[in-house]
Amino acid sequence: MEVILLTKVENLGNLGDKVRVRDGYARNYLVPQGKAKYATAENIAEFEARRAELEKAAAEALAVAEARRAKLEALEPVTIASKSGGEGKLFGSVGTHDIAEAVTAAGVEVEKREVRMPLGPIRQTGEYDIELHLHTDVNATVKVVVVAEQ
């Protein structure tokens, strides 16, 4: 099935690209999320009429994400206190939700879905570099320090 992308989609294409995707991906994800429209003649004409508006909105979203990245990278290391046993092993773990809350408390709004932890949750005390995915083109790194709770 062919669709026209209304936003940049990671690993697929940019705004305005006409791409071929599987039917289920288009029907269940891209179209309901507002990321694409079916590539009919009518939709193509409508898209071309709105192209400048969509490009402006995409540029504004990118500028906002860049500003957030600058704030995040200027941030001091974020400290999270968690209960731990001997040798720095945590009782439980520190996950995306905990990190998002701590960074938000430090002064920059971050959602749980923006936190990337490819190695899974943190289970040891120590210093970690956590990547935040703010936009398809913008990533920021925040230093998180996990300490034992007193």
UniProtKB/Swiss-Prot annotation:
It comes from the Bacteria. GO terms for cellular component: ribonucleoprotein complex; ribosome. GO terms for biological process: translation. One of its GO terms (molecular function) is structural constituent of ribosome. InterPro entries: Ribosomal_bL9, Ribosomal_bL9/RNase_H1_N, Ribosomal_bL9_bac/chp, Ribosomal_bL9_C, Ribosomal_bL9_C_sf, Ribosomal_bL9_N, Ribosomal_bL9_N_sf. The keyword Lyase does not apply. The keyword Ribonucleoprotein applies. Gene3D superfamilies: Ribosomal protein L9, C-terminal domain (3.10.430.100), Ribosomal protein L9, N-terminal domain (3.40.5.10). Keywords: Ribonucleoprotein, Ribosomal protein, RNA-binding, rRNA-binding. NCBIfam families: L9. Binds to the 23S rRNA. This is Large ribosomal subunit protein bL9. The gene is rplI.
